[in-house]
Each structure stands twice: as structure tokens, then as C-alpha cells.
């Protein structure tokens, strides 16, 4: 009998601008493999934090929406969610998925990474190789967080 519990693949919580986009992203992650996707259909900060904590998410992908008048899905609002998730789950990695065509948002994204509010971001479509890299980084954090049982 091993004293170490076998660790499941990373639990990846996904929250995009609409429930449909969230479901599609979770389905895509399921097909990609190497993780357990969790679709968070509400993008209210409290709901996202609650579900991440309840599911013990290892990684959170947050979609942004830079349309005029949609401030609750902009970089700062998504960073607010990231801060709250990390307050409860310090080892949870957070990445923003940003739509292409908004170069004016790049300084805010870079600053968020510099301040360690988020772990990174993707502009445009998230490709499988980038997601695998993020999953690999998450697995390394998970391994470091596992401590052997002291007898």
C-alpha cells in the first residue's frame, strides 16, 4: 500500500463570456485530454470563486470580452476574479483568453502578469500546444505542492 495518493489530472475550470462558449471550451479540453474540465456557466465573481473552491480547481481559464460596455469581462474585472480565486486556492494557476484585435489591452495584460495577478494569457484562439504547456506547468505546481507523509 502506498502512502501517496495518486493525483488526478489537473482540474481545469473554464469560464467564458457565454455559457455556450464555456461549454465548447470544456468540450475542447475534454477532447484534448490530460485534464478534467469543469464548465463554470456563471461569470459572476462570487460564483466563479465558489465553484473553483468547491471543485478544487488547479487551473482557471477566463475568457475576456473587450466589446464596448462590457466592463465585467475586461482585464481588470477578470484579474479581480483571479485574485479572489487565488486567495482561496493559492496554487491555482489563472490564464486569460483574450480576443484578437485589441492591442490597447496588451499593457494591462503584461502588467497583470508582472504583478502575478495571472499566470499568463493568450490572444486569439488557444491552440492545443499552448494548452498542453499550461497543463504541464500546472502539473509541476501540483507535484511541488504534494508533501510526503511524515511518520
Task: Label every PLM stretch briefly.
Residues 1-31, 38, 127-151:
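Non-catalytic signal-transmission and effector/linker regions of two-component phosphorelay proteins
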Residues 3-8, 21-24, 56-60, 64, ...:
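Conserved N-terminal glycine/acidic-rich loop preference
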Residues 10, 35-37, 92, 119:
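A structural micro-motif
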Residues 18-22, 65-71, 100-103, 127-128:
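Short acidic, S/G/P-rich loop/turn micro-motifs used as interaction or catalytic elements
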Residues 41-59, 66-69:
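Acidic, metal-coordinating helix/loop segments flanking the phosphotransfer/catalytic sites
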Residues 53-55, 84-91:
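Conserved phosphotransfer cores of two-component systems
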Residues 73-76, 80, 93-122, 126:
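Alpha4 helix (beta4-alpha4-beta5 surface) of REC/receiver domains from two-component response regulators
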